[in-house]
Amino acid sequence: MKKTQKKDKVKKGNDKMGNSFIFAINAVSPILLTVIIGYILKKVTLLTADLAKAINKLVFRVFLPVMLFNNIYKISDFGSFDPGYIIYSVIAIAVIFALCLVFVIFFTKDPKKRAALLQGSFRANYALIGIPLAEALFGAEGVAVASILSAFTIPTFNIFAVISLSIFREGGEKPDVKKILLGIVKNPLIQGVAAGAVALLIRAIFVNTVIEFRLTDIEPAYKVITWLTNLATPLSLLVLGAQFEFSAVAELKREIISGVLIRNLLIPLFGLGIAYIFCKSFGGEEFAALVAVFATPIAVSSVPMAQEMGADATLAGQLVVWSTVASTFSVFFASLILHSLGVFA
């Protein structure tokens, strides 16, 4: 009887590990395929360099802010949750930012490359891969925790991204705190998050006054928001493919290898390892959300943002592509190790 139970437990564990690998492949393959389509469109001159640049600007100033607004607004209920994992995530992202800031200063003298590398170190593809990943790892509980966490990590990612791209300016211009703060306030992505938070707060006030009202009640308006949201990611990926140059791989090999190792190896070890050692109260659902923060690839939105704010957009694009490929393994091994430690048992 005990042997049978042990065999069943091993089989169940193997099934989960297999599912993790399949999920990792299924999560990243649509991203890579869309990038390839963008690359093909460039080769047949349907997506020219000028058009790609114009679309990137449109994505950055319209589609991504609407997507972030919608992601925040869709959080159904904060309910009763432990703020510990939220505090941990935000502090860990800040520490990663600080450590990587020191690293890029010593690693390269090119301010544009510094900005792209620094942004790529901490900025996870949370909305596109992270939340579905949390659901795959720990079901409805995982996605509930990850959704709540998104209200805090997405603003954190974007604030630090603006700082990353503001402090390194070509020509050795010293960072101006006032300009950086103004850049944060004026940044379309930050404005999208802020608008989503305000709408969420208004909705909560309505609920407390027994007035049930949601944007979804205004069907035409919400349908437009949904359409614009759905355009953000595929357009970003198509443009990424159109701007991707294989010739740049050799030129940027040192930066690509360093960026991918940081994002796909060191950060998962740091973020998940410290949480496992010191945060004993975290359960499987919290760790599912943390995997989404620390083990996923670099956010696609980092490319249009790098282009619009004068960083090395070519390097940013290369980092997104190669970190996405590497994330197949980082996601798999993160879930495998956590499962073997009994976190996802």
Regions found by a protein language model. Give the residues of each.
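Alpha-helical transmembrane segments of multi-pass small-molecule/ion transporters
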Residues: 2-345
